[in-house]
Amino acid sequence: MNRPPRILVAPLDWGLGHATRCIPLIRLLLQRGCYVLVAAEGAAEHLLRTEFPQLHYLHLEGYRVRYAKTGLGLVAAIARQLPRLLKSIKAEKAWLRKTVEQYGIDAVISDNRYGLYHPDVFSVLVTHQLQIQTLLGKPGHLLLQRLHYQFINRFNACWVPDYEAAPGLAGDLSHPAKLPHVPLIYLGPLSRFYAGVDQLQHYVLVMLSGPEPQRTLLEQQLLAQLKSYGGPVLFVRGLPGTVGLPNVPYHVNIMNHLGAGAMQQALQGAQLVIARTGYSTVMELMALQKKSILIPTPGQTEQQYLARHLMKHRYALCLPQKGFGLAAAVQLAQQFNYTFPKVEDEESGLIKAIDTLLEKINTTQKAMAVKSF
């Protein structure tokens, strides 16, 4: 009798979104009887350990990217860190070769970690960003896409967490004119939450995440405005594993982190959500059809594009961080005519992808058994 398939799941460490969107993926792998190993560190590892304490965790150093304090400085900050990023990609590739041999890995699912592919093991890249946005216009987009596809095409497959029909939730990011050569599966939006009946309690929910120092800068900006706002607020800082909380007014309930179950309850009770325009956050808000105010990270071209796309379809009210006023934003949201995408069978693409992966593993195991016989 064959042993359970051993699947390595490795999320990127830019904020918490890559880890949270791996949760429904891991759930389905476990339902299919797989033995799941997780490669991560820091906040992403802590979040997944909270949800899945039974899994096997391997330490893998993240890219540890830090953003600039200003939008204009972000491009320069990323450029300075590029040599270290390329070194990290090379290092994780070498790490994977050792890990596959040591633990008998049958397949790798990498969420935006570009060095985690292996010549002898089926390797999947999960990304919604096929078209990377730049500040250089269409020529810059095309040049970066060509370089990006060189990385993507090293994998055996690419899974895109969005609807297959354009424009989807991510617009041109996930539905570019030209696609990579590797087989592509649109998973549908990935959310750790299940649609349910809201039990509104008329508070504003603040959900923070994202790389530093921008997470802290937005937190400080919002905390400074809470006294003058005055309405009930649940403030989730997005800092799993952190001890200690800042002082806040009596009408504010502040927490460092909430697990998936508690966060779903918090979302269903909120009349309005304030968060970054991170794509994983967008998927979760659309799954629950929650009204939101989204604040793109300054200088982050992907989030700037997403903000324009979401505003165009009226999926969210998106406002810049510079000059953001909490009370005025809530008033604008009350007048905003929200619409939401039609909820489809969101797990069908994910089920297809996982079952296809397991079929390939099974075929490989049978071929190896025949060869050894």
Sequence positions of predicted segments:
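Conserved nucleotide-sugar phosphate-binding/catalytic loop shared by glycosyltransferases and other
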Residues: 3-6, 13, 31-32, 36-82, ...
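A short, glycine/small-residue-rich beta-strand->loop->alpha-helix junction that serves as a flexible
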Residues: 11-23, 213-216
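Donor-nucleotide binding loops and adjacent catalytic segments primarily
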Residues: 26, 174, 188-272, 282
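Conserved nucleotide-sugar donor-binding subdomain of glycosyltransferases
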Residues: 74-115
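Active-site proximal beta-strand in glycosyltransferases
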Residues: 119-135
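A nucleotide-sugar donor-handling region in carbohydrate enzymes
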Residues: 134-213, 237-241
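A donor-sugar binding/catalytic signature common to diverse glycosyltransferases
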Residues: 263-305
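C-terminal amphipathic helix plus adjacent low-complexity
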Residues: 327-373
